[in-house]
Amino acid sequence: MGATETVDLFLELINDDNREQAVNLLAENAVMGISVPGSDERTNLRGRDRVGGWFLRAGDGFRMYTNDSRNMGGSYIADVTVMRPGAPSMHVEANFRVEGGEIVSLFLQPLSG
């Protein structure tokens, strides 16, 4: 599976509340960076358990919808709306790196405006 197919399946599983299956698409050594809105700070998670745990703890109703995307070979960059019950939706740039059908890195950065 290429980057587009892998990320599309990952998001489909997230949005269908099949987060455990989505986590299986993460590489064992996956890395995730999450930028804090309005700050220069970033949270970094390493390993499938920690990165996957972030998605597993998101709770029912957590959704990630792609508004626009581009495939850059092994990278997939998307403009994504993140929705979570009880919280305002966020507009982020999601940068996925895929190798051998597994997501090896994911970086989420809030988009302004």
Question: Model-flagged regions — what are they?
Answer:
Residues F10, Q21-V23, A30, G47, ...:
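Hydrophobic pocket/interface hotspot
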Residues G52-G113:
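A beta-strand edge to alpha-helix "cap/lid" segment located at domain peripheries
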Residues E28-S69:
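A solvent-exposed, acidic/Ser-Thr-rich amphipathic alpha-helical stretch
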Residues M1, T43-L45, G86:
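Alpha-helical interaction segments
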Residues M1-E20, N24:
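Short, low-complexity N-terminal intrinsically disordered segments enriched in polar/charged residues
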